[in-house]
Curated annotation (Swiss-Prot):
InterPro entries in the cross-refs: Hub1/Ubl5, Ubiquitin-like_domsf
ATP-binding as UniProt keyword: no
Gene: ubl5
Keywords for the protein's UniProt record, in alphabetical order: Cytoplasm, Ubl conjugation pathway
BP GO annotations: mRNA splicing, via spliceosome; protein modification process
Species per Swiss-Prot/TrEMBL record: Danio rerio
Protein's name in the database: Ubiquitin-like protein 5
Domain Ubiquitin-like: 1-73
Domain of life: Eukaryota
Length: 73
């Protein structure tokens, strides 16, 4: 079980607990449950890498305590 921190730079910082086998789409659904936005409208980035929904967190080497950038469409 890992904890990922997502910051949208607008004052909202979300901490989500998930597994490394979970996909980015699963992570977006957990974030959407906490923020109240639809998961389809969420974009997760790290630097210039936009994360795809079907790839797992382990494949992107997302570890415990990692910060991701949260954007809305």
């Amino acid at each position: 079980m890992i904890e990922v921190v997502c910051n949208d730079r607008l004052g909202k910082k979300v901490r989500v607990k998930c597994n490394q086998e979970d996909t980015i789409g699963d992570l977006k659904k957990l974030i959407a449950a906490q923020t109240g936005t639809r998961w389809e409208k969420i974009v997760l980035k790290k630097w210039y890498t936009i994360f795809k929904n079907h790839v797992s967190l382990g494949d992107y080497e997302i570890h415990d305590g990692m910060n991701l950038e949260l954007y809305y469409l």
